[in-house]
């Protein structure tokens, strides 16, 4: 792997993690029939951030933010890394 391909591969992996987390968070919201206001309170963010999440705007979120939001809402997280 060259230095030129490393950032692209990292961005792809990061994107996949963010998209996966956001899908789970949207499911959490849907399963509980939460309004944007309810979800914002549960995740500890503004309603506009919830609308961005529900719209799948993954480029607006970093993994750390999504982890913190999920934790505030009481979601259980697991990380699996394999080779």
Segments the model singles out, each with a brief description of its role:
Residues 1-24:
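N-terminal flexible/basic segments that precede or flank functional cores
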Residues 21-24, 49, 65:
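Hydrophobic alpha-helical segments typical of transmembrane helices
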Residues 29, 40, 70:
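The alpha-helix within a helix-turn-helix
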Residues 33-51:
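Short alpha-helical DNA-recognition segment
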Residues 54:
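DNA major-groove recognition helix of helix-turn-helix
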Residues 63-79:
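DNA major-groove recognition helix of helix-turn-helix/homeodomain DNA-binding modules
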């Amino acid at each position: 792997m060259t230095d030129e391909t490393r950032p692209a591969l990292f961005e792809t992996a990061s994107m996949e993690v963010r998209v996966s987390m956001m899908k789970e968070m949207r499911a959490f919201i849907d399963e509980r029939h939460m309004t944007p206001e309810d979800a914002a309170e549960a995740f500890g963010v503004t309603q506009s951030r919830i609308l961005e999440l529900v719209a799948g705007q993954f480029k607006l979120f970093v993994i750390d933010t999504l982890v913190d939001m999920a934790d505030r809402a009481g979601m259980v997280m697991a990380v699996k890394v394999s080779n």
